[in-house]
Amino acid sequence: MAKVSSIKKNESRKKKSQSLHNKRSALKSKIYDKNISLEERFSLVMSLAQLPRNSSSTRIRNRCELTGRPRGVTRKFGISRNKLRELIGRGLVPGVVKSSW
């Protein structure tokens, strides 16, 4: 099990990222627009820098939904490889069977 504080911190990052996603993407699209003057683009960069760091989507860590493990998490299931193997072995994941040949 991962520390509860690290799981909670990641959850708050997800919420903050979702709430400020539209604002952040609008600023980025204006910054990369070459038709806007350099001074105005610089002011947009400064306003982007004023947003909280945790509102960036790159700060979010994929964690296992069951254990909170930060590494070895499959995107399709959202579960770490260890728990996924365990659940598949018990037959609890529908549509997935252990291969044998």
UniProtKB/Swiss-Prot annotation:
Disulfide bond as UniProt keyword: no
Pfam families, sorted: Ribosomal_S14
- Which key words tag this protein in UniProt? Ribonucleoprotein, Ribosomal protein, RNA-binding, rRNA-binding
Disulfide bond residue pairs: none
InterPro entries tied to this protein:
Ribosomal_uS14 (IPR001209), Ribosomal_uS14_bac/plastid (IPR023036), Ribosomal_uS14_CS (IPR018271)
- Comp. bias regions, Basic residues: 11-26
Return the PANTHER family for the record.
Answer: 30S RIBOSOMAL PROTEIN S14 (PTHR19836), SMALL RIBOSOMAL SUBUNIT PROTEIN US14M (PTHR19836:SF19)
Q: What is this protein called?
A: Small ribosomal subunit protein uS14
Swiss-Prot/TrEMBL GO biological process terms: translation
The role this protein plays is: Binds 16S rRNA, required for the assembly of 30S particles and may also be responsible for determining the conformation of the 16S rRNA at the A site.
Q: Which HAMAP family match?
A: Ribosomal_uS14_1
Q: What is the lineage of its organism?
A: Bacteria, Pseudomonadati, Pseudomonadota, Alphaproteobacteria, Rickettsiales
Q: Name one GO cellular component term.
A: small ribosomal subunit
NCBIfam families in the cross-refs: PRK08881.1
